[in-house]
Amino acid sequence: MIIHNLGIKDYTEIWEQMKEFTAIRDSNSYDELWLLEHYPVYTQGQAGKPEHVLNPNSIKIVQSDRGGQVTYHGPGQLVAYVLMDIRRRNLGIRTLVAKLEEILISVLEHYRIPANIRSGAPGVYVGEKKIASIGLRVKNGCTYHGIALNVNMDLSPFLGINPCGFAKMEMTQMSHFHPNIQLEEVSQHLVQYFLTQFK
């Protein structure tokens, strides 16, 4: 597993790089985890519906090829893209999603933030509020896209959409519990728990 820390990047640029990496990889290619933040952007998943974008203002909307519905990415949100050969690892997509949820819950528990999952609504929640999203694409047995964890960001753009297709879905973030939390530190813990699950 190769870990890349990419800083803050344009969504479309990284999306193209993920598709290119997945297209040219072979059975000997290492799996990779890309850690980054994005400039403000709304992304529509394959199941996304235009009516779930309520008020985009000046934020760009990108029609993506990941699973799921609409979400928002912006600075202060930790994004981890999972470029993994799940066929080689004998992993089903549902098992992978469950493991990613476990990793996110472990990170949050490290900070004593009580997290949970909800049946039929992938992602991780604190009470009824969503703190992390998951959206993947599988091509030729390999995944790309991944997870987004709200660390210390401006949550107001989420008010312009129905996050993940749920009207009135409230969002939260780690800084509500730890005002001085640093994204870089959270990223280190996420990598630690990720490598515990996936050697």
From Swiss-Prot:
Reaction(s) catalysed by this chain's protein: octanoyl-[ACP] + L-lysyl-[protein] = N(6)-octanoyl-L-lysyl-[protein] + holo-[ACP] + H(+)
PROSITE patterns attached to this UniProt entry: BPL_LPL_CATALYTIC, LIPB
Gene Ontology annotations for the cellular component aspect, listed alphabetically: cytoplasm
Annotated site, Lowers pKa of active site Cys, chain positions: 130
The protein's Enzyme Commission number: 2.3.1.181
Gene3D superfamilies given in the database record: Bira Bifunctional Protein, Domain 2
Miscellaneous note of the record: In the reaction, the free carboxyl group of octanoic acid is attached via an amide linkage to the epsilon-amino group of a specific lysine residue of lipoyl domains of lipoate-dependent enzymes.
Name this polypeptide is given: Octanoyltransferase
Name of the gene this protein is made from: lipB
